[in-house]
From Swiss-Prot:
Keyword presence, Signal: no
Species this chain originates from: Rhizobium rhizogenes (strain K84 / ATCC BAA-868)
Family per similarity comment: Belongs to the TrpF family.
Pathway membership: Amino-acid biosynthesis; L-tryptophan biosynthesis; L-tryptophan from chorismate: step 3/5
Gene designation: trpF
CDD domains per UniProt: PRAI
EC number of this enzyme: 5.3.1.24
Catalysed reactions, as listed in the record: N-(5-phospho-beta-D-ribosyl)anthranilate = 1-(2-carboxyphenylamino)-1-deoxy-D-ribulose 5-phosphate
NCBIfam families according to UniProt: PRK01222.1-1 (NF002295)
The protein, known as: N-(5'-phosphoribosyl)anthranilate isomerase
InterPro entries the record matches: Aldolase_TIM, PRAI_dom, RibuloseP-bd_barrel, TrpF_fam
Length: 222
């Protein structure tokens, strides 16, 4: 099965079109103002129309209020809400009930204890995204270009459908997929020339690597 590929933090028509042309299954807009990948909802709404019907549109939020979500959903009309903050299971349930959209819950990982928090969200979140915990001093919950120990993912069973993020790029994506049960990967800094600047050439290089790769089967027991 081919993995889902999400290009996150898109801000320009050029990067959006290249991601779509090369086969991105998901495209993400970041609505966290401290991020260099932040985009105003009205601009995101215009870019989203280029992707509608071609890839899943993902709205990435961090501890959003209902007012935040009202604006984003009205202007962008996303297919999926990604919650990348400290949203509780109860808050995730409320968001799903109010907005009737699938939720991808992002979880920051440094060690096995971090993964144990997943249990509380199983059956609530529709999918998970596992990212590395931010380095000390970083204000960004994701997109830091930092990886974590993917062998930790062996703790998870097939109740957990997830994407991998955190420092994924053209050089390590095959290893990430082969050593875990991940059904998709999420790229942001891995296809940038500078923070927040998606590079169509790097997008090409990544998808060229995907096309050339012979992805091994997932590791036994992972």
């Amino acid at each position: 099965m081919n993995p889902d590929i999400k290009i996150c933090g898109l801000k320009t028509p050029e990067a959006m079109d290249r991601a779509l042309e090369r086969g991105a299954t998901h495209v993400g807009f970041i609505f966290f103002e401290k991020s260099p990948r932040y985009i105003e909802p009205d601009l995101a709404g215009k870019l989203a129309e280029r992707a509608r019907g071609k890839a899943k549109i993902v709205a990435v939020t961090v501890n959003p209020t209902n007012d935040d979500l009202d604006e984003i959903i009205s202007l962008v009309r996303p297919d999926i809400l990604q919650l990348h903050g400290n949203e509780s299971p109860e808050r995730v349930l409320t968001i799903k009930a109010v907005y009737n959209l699938p939720v991808m819950k992002a979880m920051s990982v440094r060690d096995a204890d971090d993964l144990k928090r997943v249990e509380a969200y199983i059956g609530i979140a529709d999918r998970f995204l596992f990212d590395a915990k931010p380095p000390a001093g970083s204000e960004l919950p994701g997109g830091n270009g930092v990886s974590f120990d993917w062998s930790l993912m062996s703790w998870l069973d097939d109740r957990v459908d997830y994407m991998l993020s955190g420092g994924v790029n053209k050089d390590n994506f095959a290893q990430a997929l082969a050593s875990t049960r991940a059904t998709g990967i999420d790229l942001s800094s891995g296809v940038e020339s500078a923070p927040g600047v998606k590079d169509p050439k790097k997008i090409d290089e990544f998808f060229d690597a995907v096309a050339e790769a012979c992805l091994p089967e997932p590791a036994a027991g992972s």
